């Protein structure tokens, strides 16, 4: 049975959805005012995997990820660029979708935008005011945290501690310094919408509560997001939604950890931002997804050259074995080798065990690597094709592609991917493929002429360049050493 770490209880819990066989999942998406950095995409990759696994278990999943398209950052950036907030947000929603598609992730079922849900937001704020959970103050509407006795139950903080340690600006409009805005009165020159309290725009937290209520109703199964959203954003969502409906808002809270860059959290102020667009121009979507999924979603992950090298090495191992397997496959090969099929079946049980324990992707990867090791031990490039070899190749191929369908990995033709991977590395090494081909061909001629001294000299030269050469009955093959 699937167990999920619930951020609210801080424990592993058996997964039982509110409605048998169906899962309602909402994940906080980006505030769209610029190109998004690689840290912003950890959540989309993680929850894409979560959705895939839930569907593998037989659940019908409805998955929404929102766009915050009105916000202080959007307004300020739009003013800097001389654009309207709508023009700016639409531009960067389109750019996000390009990056998302480049990553080979499955589209969400819904991508609600804040500006499309103003009626829902106003309605929810009105409900909270009528229930005396919120109050109007000079055109603002503020949520009274004292009206919600369970405030702090997600983050584990209590209001006394929050007040004691808070650096909260003094605001005479607030009854309690920790009260937060549901609706903000319009400022001169800012975009605004009409409301019973005068023109204004929504506070950040009410947006998700209102969109979820409109899309899913009063309760959802899974609410996801980054750990940095636990407080105050998700804490405030609980207060708003449960204060409004009186029902438990979310059954399972899931939070992915952050990406660090050189031991520091990515931030514009530190100047260590790498956008996803920049990363994909330098590297490859498979590399990014491997970096994210080879670590458990709740662990802090480092992003940098060493992480890229580990991802390249891991992908190369799997894709090299997959390429070899596919070289033995033809449309006529339909029967898996029974002995190797047993190896893959046993490994799949380990994958399921790992994934059902809070989506344990590192252990699932370990099970996959054991299958790669077994395949490489039993099948070598250049072996003559026969039913046994082809049956092993088919069983291996099916296992890796099945694993890939859960992770949205291994989506590319294996041989073509390896060429692309080598070209990427050659570019970083300032080497041309044609130059390596020429050296390998020259070495082949020396071997054919039995000039072994020259052959060995050329091999040493090739190795010094960071290239590995393999000699098989079919000829010599080279790849960048990984």
Curated annotation (Swiss-Prot):
GO molecular function, one term: zinc ion binding
Free-text cofactor note: Binds 1 zinc ion per subunit.
Localization (cell): Cytoplasm
Superkingdom of the organism of origin: Bacteria
UniProt binding sites for Zn(2+): 28, 208, 233, 237
TM spans (from-to): none
A family per Pfam: CysS_C
Residue ranges of the motif 'HIGH' region: 30-40
Extent of motif 'KMSKS' region: 265-269
Requisite cofactors: Zn(2+)
InterPro entries according to UniProt: Cys-tRNA-ligase, Cys-tRNA-synt_Ia_DALR, Cys-tRNA/MSH_ligase, CysS_C, Rossmann-like_a/b/a_fold, tRNA-synt_1_cat_dom, tRNAsynth_Ia_anticodon-bd
UniProt keywords, alphabetically: Aminoacyl-tRNA synthetase, ATP-binding, Cytoplasm, Ligase, Metal-binding, Nucleotide-binding, Protein biosynthesis, Zinc
Catalytic reaction annotation: tRNA(Cys) + L-cysteine + ATP = L-cysteinyl-tRNA(Cys) + AMP + diphosphate
GO cellular component: cytosol
EC number annotated for this UniProt entry: 6.1.1.16
GO terms (BP aspect): cysteinyl-tRNA aminoacylation
Binding site for ATP: 268
Quaternary structure and interacting proteins, as annotated: Monomer.
Similarity comment: Belongs to the class-I aminoacyl-tRNA synthetase family.
PANTHER family assigned: CYSTEINE--TRNA LIGASE, CYTOPLASMIC, CYSTEINYL-TRNA SYNTHETASE
Name of the protein in its database record: Cysteine--tRNA ligase
Species per Swiss-Prot/TrEMBL record: Bdellovibrio bacteriovorus (strain ATCC 15356 / DSM 50701 / NCIMB 9529 / HD100)
């Amino acid at each position: 049975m699937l167990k999920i770490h619930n951020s609210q209880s801080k424990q592993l819990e058996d997964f039982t959805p509110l409605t048998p066989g169906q899962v309602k999942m909402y994940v906080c998406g980006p505030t769209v005012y610029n190109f998004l950095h690689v840290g912003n995409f950890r959540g989309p990759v993680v929850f894409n995997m979560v959705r895939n696994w839930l569907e593998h278990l037989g659940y019908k999943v409805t998955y929404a990820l929102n766009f915050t398209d009105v916000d202080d950052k959007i307004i300020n950036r739009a003013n800097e660029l001389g654009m309207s907030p709508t023009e700016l947000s639409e531009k960067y929603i389109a750019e996000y979708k390009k990056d998302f598609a480049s990553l080979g992730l499955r589209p969400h079922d819904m991508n609600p935008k804040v500006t499309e849900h103003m009626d829902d937001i106003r309605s929810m704020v009105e409900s909270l005011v009528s229930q005396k959970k919120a109050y109007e103050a000079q055109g603002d509407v503020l949520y009274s945290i004292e009206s919600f006795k369970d405030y702090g139950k997600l983050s584990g903080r209590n209001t006394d501690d929050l007040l004691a340690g808070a650096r909260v600006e003094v605001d005479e409009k607030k009854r309690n310094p920790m009260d937060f805005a549901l609706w903000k009165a319009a400022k001169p020159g800012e975009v605004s919408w009409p409301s019973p309290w005068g023109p204004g725009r929504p506070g950040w937290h009410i947006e998700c509560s209102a969109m979820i209520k409109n899309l899913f109703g009063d309760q959802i199964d899974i609410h996801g997001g980054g750990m940095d959203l636990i407080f105050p954003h998700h804490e405030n969502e609980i207060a708003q939604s449960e204060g409004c409906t009186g029902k438990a808002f979310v059954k399972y809270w899931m939070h992915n950890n952050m990406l660090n860059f050189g031991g520091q959290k990515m931030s514009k102020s530190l100047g260590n931002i790498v956008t996803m667009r920049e990363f994909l121009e330098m590297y490859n979507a498979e590399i990014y997804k491997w970096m994210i999924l080879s670590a458990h979603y709740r662990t802090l992950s480092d992003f940098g050259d060493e992480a890229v090298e580990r991802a390249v090495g891991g992908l190369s191992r799997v894709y090299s074995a997959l390429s070899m397997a596919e070289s033995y496959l033809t449309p006529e090969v339909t029967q898996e080798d029974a002995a190797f099929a047993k190896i893959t079946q046993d490994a799949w049980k380990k994958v399921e065990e790992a994934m059902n324990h809070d989506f344990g992707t590192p252990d699932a990867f370990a099970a996959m690597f054991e299958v790669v090791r077994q395949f490489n031990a039993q099948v070598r490039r250049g072996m003559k094709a026969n039913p046994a070899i082809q049956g092993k190749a088919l069983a291996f191929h099916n296992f890796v592609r099945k694993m890939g369908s859960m992770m949205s990995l291994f989506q590319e033709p294996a041989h073509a991917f390896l060429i692309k991977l080598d070209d990427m590395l050659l570019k970083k090494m300032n080497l041309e493929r044609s130059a390596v081909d020429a050296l390998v061909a020259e070495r082949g001629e020396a071997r054919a002429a039995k000039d072994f001294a020259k052959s060995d000299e050329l091999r040493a030269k090739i190795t010094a360049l960071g290239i590995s050469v393999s000699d098989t009955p079919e000829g010599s093959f080279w790849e960048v050493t990984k």
